[in-house]
């Protein structure tokens, strides 16, 4: 009953403003990346540009970005003006680890469960691959197209999902249904991007949420773990290039945020004012954790293509 009441009264934070695509440029002199919108000046580095898509539910479209954690939107925030933090930070983290420029796209659908993502994401992903710039050498746009007029393939697709499916458990939907739908979604994604693309299924660190009072918080966390176990199960159904990423601990996320912001870890809030979605710091820490975990798989996938 308490869960049903929260579902009925919950008000979500708004989506991030700004672009849904951009470019994280790797700076060899500082070993860091800077994020820009696509279409800026290019560099003839001879280095392959990577392409990453962060797709899925409200976390992919940046719900909570620009919120200071107390329900107030900051006047000038990078996430508020530059698009979803999760996709941008994932591209930055990937670029720093892979020493490469990373083109990013965010394909988020607020409120979507996995069944909804099968209807909405696949057409959007197919359209996005028409404009993905992956295998060029950072020359002009025309040189990045292949002989069919298409851009080259996407290197990584991160699928954010689970929380909206978890809400369906209130009305009796089982975790096995989520697993079946997710398996089909992954297959459909791979039909679009190819088996050489790394598909990433991250677990959700729901422990950071402040929305749920005890004992509901303990129940919600355990249920979330059960849904995350289905992601791990799905990843094992595929021979290669489907990766489950376990969730980071709260301490690890705060340490990452402290390193990024220069603030004391214990003082950092990771959740926006709606009590469940990450704020900018939370998204950044989570995204960099995902990036770190998927680098070995991505390196193997790229090596296999040579």
What kind of feature is each model-predicted range?
Residues 1-54, 60-67, 297-298, 302-306:
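N-terminal secretory targeting modules
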Residues 49-53, 59-180:
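Conserved SGNH/GDSL esterase-like catalytic core that processes O-acyl groups on lipids
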Residues 164, 205-208:
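Short "lid" loop at the C-terminus of a central beta-strand within the Rossmann-like core
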Residues 209-246:
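Substrate-gating cap/lid alpha-helix
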Residues 267-306:
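Histidine-centered active-site loop/cap adjacent to the catalytic His
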């Amino acid at each position: 009953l308490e869960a049903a009441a929260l579902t009925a009264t919950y008000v979500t934070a708004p989506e991030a403003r700004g672009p849904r695509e951009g470019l994280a440029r790797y700076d060899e002199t500082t070993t860091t990346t800077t994020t820009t919108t696509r279409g800026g000046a290019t560099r003839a580095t001879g280095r392959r540009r990577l392409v990453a898509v962060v797709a899925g539910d409200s976390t992919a479209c940046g719900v909570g970005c620009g919120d200071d954690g107390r329900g107030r939107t900051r006047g000038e925030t990078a996430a508020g003006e530059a698009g979803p933090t999760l996709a941008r930070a994932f591209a930055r983290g990937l670029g720093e680890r892979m020493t490469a420029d990373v083109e990013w796209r965010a394909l988020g659908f607020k409120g979507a469960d996995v069944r909804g993502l099968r209807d909405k994401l696949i057409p959007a992903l197919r359209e996005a691959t028409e404009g993905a710039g992956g295998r060029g050498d950072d020359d002009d746009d025309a040189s990045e197209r292949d002989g069919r007029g298409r851009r080259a393939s996407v290197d990584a697709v991160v699928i954010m999902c689970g929380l909206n499916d978890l809400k369906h458990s209130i009305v009796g939907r089982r975790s096995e249904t989520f697993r079946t739908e997710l398996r089909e979604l992954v297959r459909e994604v791979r039909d679009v991007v190819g088996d050489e693309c790394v598909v990433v299924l991250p677990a959700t660190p729901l422990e950071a949420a402040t929305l749920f009072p005890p004992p509901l918080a303990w129940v919600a966390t355990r249920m979330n773990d059960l849904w995350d176990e289905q992601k791990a199960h799905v990843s094992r159904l595929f021979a290669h290039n489907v990766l489950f990423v376990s969730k980071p601990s709260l301490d690890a996320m705060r340490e990452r945020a402290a390193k990024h912001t220069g603030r004391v870890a214990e003082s950092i809030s990771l959740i926006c004012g709606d009590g469940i979605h990450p704020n900018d710091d939370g998204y950044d820490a989570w995204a960099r954790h995902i990036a770190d975990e998927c680098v070995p798989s991505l390196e193997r996938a790229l090596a296999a293509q040579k």
